[in-house]
Amino acid sequence: MEIRKDYDAHEVEEKWLKLWKDEMYYFDWNSEKPHYIIDTPPPYPTGSFHIGHALNWCIIDFIARYKRMNGYEVMFPQGWDCHGLPTEVKVEEKYGIKKGDIPRDEFRRLCVEFTEENIAKMRETARRMGYSIDWSKEYITMYPEYYSKTQLSFVRMYNKGLIYRDYHPVVFCPRCETTIALAEIEYRQGKTKLNYIKFDDDVIIATTRPELIPACVAIAVHPDDERNKHLIGKKVRVPTTPYEVEVIADEEVDPEFGTGVVMICTFGDRQDVKWWKKHKLELRNIVGRDGRLNEKAGRYAGMTIPEAREAILEDLKKEGKLLKQVEIDHNVGTCWRCKTPVEIIPAEQWFVKVEKEKILEAAKRIKWVPEHMYSRLESWVQSMEWDWVISRQRIFATPIPAWYCKNCGEVVVAKEEWLPVDPTATQPPEPCPKCGSTEFRGETDVLDTWMDSSITPLMICGWPSLKEYPTHLRPQGHDIIRTWAFYTILRSLALEGQIPWYEIVINGMVFGEDGRKMSKSLGNVIVPEEVVEKYGVDALRQWAASGVIGDDIIFNWKDVIAASRFQQKFWSITRFTLMHISDYTPSEEDKKLLRDADRWILSKLNRLVGEVRKHMDEYRFDEAIKAIRTFTWYEYADNYLEIVKNRLYSGSEEEKRAAKFVLSYALDVLTRLLAPITPFMAEECWSHFREGSVHLQSYPVVEEEFLDERAEKAGEEIKEIVAAVRKFKHDKGLALNAPLKKLIVYSKLDGLDVRDIAGATNSEVEIVTEMPEVRERVKELKPKFAIIGPMFREKAKTLIKAVGSLSKEEKERLLKEGAIQVNLDGASVEVKAEWFEAVTEKSIEGREVEMLETANSVVFVEV
């Protein structure tokens, strides 16, 4: 069968996408193979499969394919985390509506349709990338079969006392008009003004948020601050307001910030919440859910926060209370979605209890890769100041399965058998357990999207009737440790009392070629389709493999190009191999025919197998692909294949069979080594010389019979000798296949095989085990004109002629002693050896030779 010379990645990929069957990757609960269950991240269906997705899923696919080839029954599911604000915004934009303009169920229907379209686009890209996903295990969180389980988890945690409703300060996004969790706050660096404001003559505070002055409920100083501790207990009037507050002491006040005097507002930040709780202060909330100040702000009521800031500063100036303003660097808490500065306001919300110590103890029982990523979770958990707020003021999300009795206000949470349920559309089938009323108001708040995605390991294992648990692996990015990883551990403990996975592998983010975060405004965004269109999927997958797990990775076109070139190289190796083994069937007898070079490369190849297996087991895909490529290109193609070509073309039948055995074996092993990383190329190569799919084969294991230290030494020596002779020919301007008179090789290794040295150098070869006596004589002394010319000027030529006429013995004495006396126009002149370059000739046993030294041998080229 004729095989084209150039590897066409697009043609190959298109071919196998049509031929591969989904059933190849279906997970069977009844399989007797050991199970390996991957809790894959369900992406948000934006419709665009970005480069970060490509990286994440490549890593997952490397693991899934590797584990399958090692005899595991692998579950690689695909989910879609659908609910959330971005879809609501896109639907509002698409249809030119606001969510309140149409019935809730109609708005949700539009969101579902929009999301289904996006899922279809992303599903197509995932298939195009060759990911070995079990599509029979696909889940979509917006469908009742999934969100009914989210609701079930809510009910069970509520019944365990782990979910409760309370009036408490929460983080609120005025633009999105919903609460968000602490983990969803993004801090953005910027510039702001630190305002120095006089409350009383001796009370001056410094604040970045003057608009919250009407919410000031106390002034605080550090108890040991010599400048300000005399103020403790003093009553102070709050400027621009009718309020009076007390100065209190607290150790958490930073005496070095501003004036060392701070105002406590309800609420400027999380520190205010801590102080409010600790000192049992008054609650005066002045910011509404729309981001405007309310009636408690007095004359500033109805203003937006920026408007109130300007108005209050203007009033302070008029009253002479604004002493100065200083520009400072400032971190502002913003909404993770819309980047609007968030506010902390008190509200009646649903919360999940966060049991910090239990979560951290469980997290320690999980293997973290890299290990240091655990500390990120630990730092986040320790920094949490209140429980997880799970209610959101949106529509497109899992409904909270609860009602409120209109008669007595009793909260009625759904029973398990009522699920799934939308409380805004359905009344509970039973009367109020407290007063017997049948009049209810359905909960209009919905659940945080993380309530859906934090039960993914439970869902894929059949919860609530678990078939197996925990899962084996959670692969995810470091950017969602404090959300997805944290919430999943919390929920798994709450619902099943177990860790969700045995191991968690954390990958990094993808940055542009300029080393910065990808952004349309920076013009450094790369999409997977662009890479695939130019160089194919496997080249992109090799790039993904080049990143170190846990580290951020820079997208670099040169890495993709190098990957593409390697594929062409491997394809050329495959073509060369198939050309020679088309009529060959390996046999055990052929092993007896192996020569030094054969045993060398087989030993090196098996050591490569051991090295790659170790790297793959440790998720060091970067080291694995590097080792495979280095061996394949340099050891195997550039050296072994070049060494045995003469044997393949001109050798005896036995010599050919030995080489063909190696070619067949090496192509088999290398193709299987590459299969998890370059599935298309591996399948195409495999199909030309083996039956079935390479992805249904076993991953290579080290075959001890081929490990041979003596052969490795011999092979390295042969490689060095051939390389030295080739360089000699190149330097002499000879063709690489030009014959040489004879090579005499001194080697300390007993029985070094000369067949392949002779064939690769096109020369007669003699091996000697004792170093020959090398005689060296001066053939010529080349003058260094740059030295002699300036020293002797018009007599330089005479000096050079005089030295040239010296006898061989005199020339050798000059080199040995460093200087001799020479007669120059009747005068004795000292001539130094350093003025000349000695050209010598070597000989052994009377034969003139060129001597080439390698690391392990000496080669004499007879001339």
From Swiss-Prot:
Catalysed conversion reaction: tRNA(Val) + L-valine + ATP = L-valyl-tRNA(Val) + AMP + diphosphate
Gene3D superfamilies (UniProt xref): HUPs (3.40.50.620), Isoleucyl-tRNA Synthetase, Domain 1 (1.10.730.10)
GO cellular component, one term: cytosol
Listed EC numbers: 6.1.1.9
Described function: Catalyzes the attachment of valine to tRNA(Val). As ValRS can inadvertently accommodate and process structurally similar amino acids such as threonine, to avoid such errors, it has a 'posttransfer' editing activity that hydrolyzes mischarged Thr-tRNA(Val) in a tRNA-dependent manner.
An example Gene Ontology molecular-function term: valine-tRNA ligase activity
Organism: Archaeoglobus fulgidus (strain ATCC 49558 / DSM 4304 / JCM 9628 / NBRC 100126 / VC-16)
Pfam families: Anticodon_1 (PF08264), tRNA-synt_1 (PF00133)
Keywords: Aminoacyl-tRNA synthetase, ATP-binding, Cytoplasm, Ligase, Nucleotide-binding, Protein biosynthesis
Family named by the database record: Belongs to the class-I aminoacyl-tRNA synthetase family. ValS type 2 subfamily.
Motif ('KMSKS' region): 517-521
Protein's cellular compartments: Cytoplasm
Short sequence motif named 'HIGH' region, residue ranges: 43-53
Residues at which ATP binds: 520
Name by which UniProt lists this protein: Valine--tRNA ligase
Residues annotated as transmembrane: none
